């Protein structure tokens, strides 16, 4: 019985030590002071109205253009910021020895105008995935050689790659 209780206690300690909170864009209010101290531009730290944003922790106000989209998570030892929508940028630190995120020039500005871009990208990739599937189906129906099929797929890949700058505008 003592062995069983010892194993149960050890297992619960391991679970506590390896606990990881889920990634969230809305940390609890009691944790906002912690998260907003070390990455000040995260959107969950600010209450924005009429192009002016007020910090929820220290009541400081800034322009809306310097706010970025952030997600946060933590495990037993480290705290992790996932910053941006298009180009991933990460900041991790030990929760007990936090450090300020000072590379705000790499943080992408977040505004509601990104939603049309995200929707456009999703539609674009959906159309091109149908094009890839159609290319493979065409090659199978016409009984084309593998070399010809690969050339068609490479051509479609080049078109996708070349259209990226246009899509991101």
From Swiss-Prot:
Subcellular location: Host membrane
Major site of localization recorded for this protein: host cell
Alphabetized Pfam families for the sequence: v110
UniProt KW Transmembrane helix keyword: yes
Functional description taken from the UniProt entry: Plays a role in virus cell tropism, and may be required for efficient virus replication in macrophages.
Family: Belongs to the asfivirus MGF 110 family.
Protein name: Protein MGF 110-12L
Organism: African swine fever virus (isolate Pig/Kenya/KEN-50/1950)
